[in-house]
Amino acid sequence: MLKIKLEKTTFENAKAECSLVFIVNKDFSHAWVKNKELLETFKYEGEGVFLDQENKILYAGVKEDDVHLLRESACLAVRTLKKLAFKSVKVGVYTCGTHSKDNALLENLKALFLGLKLGLYEYDTFKSNKKESVLKEAIVALELHKPCEKTCANSLEKSAKEALKYAEIMTESLNIVRDLVNTPPMIGTPVYMAEVAQKVAKENHLEIHVYDEKFLEEKKMNAFLAVNKASLGVNPPRLIHLVYKPKKAKKKIALVGKGLTYDCGGLSLKPADYMVTMKADKGGGSAVIGLLNVLAKLGVEAEVHGIIGATENMIGPAAYKPDDILISKEGKSIEVRNTDAEGRLVLADCLSYAQDLNPDVIVDFATLTGACVVGLGEFTSAIMGHNEELKNLFETSGLESGELLAKLPFNRHLKKLIESKIADVCNISSSRYGGAITAGLFLNEFIRDEFKDKWLHIDIAGPAYVEKEWDVNSFGASGAGVRACTAFVEELLKKA
């Protein structure tokens, strides 16, 4: 991980092997830009990166005056620098976006530091010849690249320290999630997932309970159990329950995650091409583990419960079947018409378990539907639920964190598509349309009336795992949901 060192000095006086200078909104006028003739010769107009080898300066373009583009550009710059031979880089402080906001400086620093730190991530566990980055340190000169109000300058050091703490915690947590999601299925089993959760619990002094199939049977979590039937003798299920309890808690929050460590579709077998990347079906459960790490280290004033349903969905003689009828923990019967709609079965029982804790807010995370990716693209998560205020808060705070989110509305017509003639509800829609919403409506069937306005469903199927670099995310797992939910919890507690 890149070490960031704060120094109370000017950018010119800071010492490092190379310099990183951002060109914000194609503005070449500030003093840190050197050798403008060279930039003009090579027609560098402030987009992408450009290396001035003579002066050892890497220029990185920030296309617009936008804090999210600053974060992305910082990440791109580090990705470029790690291919070079510099051990250290110096950078100043930039302010982008809405300068009138009270926390504008802090948010810019968070974005800068997080972008720098995430730029070094690469999942290379199984590479024979690992290429370790020479770049080890970023020196941040506590000098603003352009004048601002005196109050802004006076708060620079304090804001920088707070932002650095956030960036270090968030980077560590995102990388825990990324590593877990990227772990191949022969290693990343339900038991392995529980072991990762136990490490996080131990480090943060969290309470943790890991339950096996016997507990699931006792609690009548039959929908969850059914999904695991083909794997029971080899990779049994685990219900993981993490608990963070601060001395002072304004809210009790339950975070629920789908932890499908591998999903071949069960007897409703996926085509071969669609099985590839299904190690990422544990993205929701992994995000919950990462969130407990973030929220505990930040010391938020909320009692937080992280509940993960970890299992495989495989084929075998004991596998559950289309036409099965399952009795869930809530007592509702489920007609199974497609065994590849399994994540919602696991979540149904886990959400029931979460409601028994009587939380003030419930948020579930799942790589639930391909339909969500079709509708919103691979970079955007969907928000569903009944409480407009809660949905709006998650969307606005999540967007400010740098994640992309959009609300999808429930409606009575789509609800009819999951009706069953022989059970209380069907696990698959009778129509090919609106699949992300009908999956959310299925989960809604297991939310008790008193919790309807306390529950949010986040479908992270698109951004949880993308096979290319984008924004601050490397090839593979991104840690989708972690930044957004952290911001949501912080804003929720401000209103408490």
Swiss-Prot record:
Residues noted as binding Mn(2+) 2 in the record, renumbered to the chain: 258, 263, 281, 342
Catalytic activity: Release of an N-terminal amino acid, Xaa-|-Yaa-, in which Xaa is preferably Leu, but may be other amino acids including Pro although not Arg or Lys, and Yaa may be Pro. Amino acid amides and methyl esters are also readily hydrolyzed, but rates on arylamides are exceedingly low; Release of an N-terminal amino acid, preferentially leucine, but not glutamic or aspartic acids
Co-factor note (free text): Binds 2 manganese ions per subunit.
Co-factor(s): Mn(2+)
Enzyme class: hydrolase
Primary location: cytoplasm
Entry keyword Protein biosynthesis: no
Active site: 270, 344
Keywords: Aminopeptidase, Cytoplasm, Hydrolase, Manganese, Metal-binding, Protease
Family annotation (InterPro entries): Leucine_aapep/pepB, Macro_dom-like, Peptidase_M17_C, Peptidase_M17_leu_NH2_pept, Peptidase_M17_N
Places the protein is found: Cytoplasm
GO cellular component: cytoplasm
EC number: 3.4.11.1, 3.4.11.10
Family under the similarity heading: Belongs to the peptidase M17 family.
NCBIfam families referenced in this protein's UniProt entry, alphabetically: PRK00913.3-1 (NF002079), PRK00913.3-3 (NF002081)
Primary role: Presumably involved in the processing and regular turnover of intracellular proteins. Catalyzes the removal of unsubstituted N-terminal amino acids from various peptides.
Name of the protein: Probable cytosol aminopeptidase
Lineage: Bacteria, Pseudomonadati, Campylobacterota, Epsilonproteobacteria, Campylobacterales
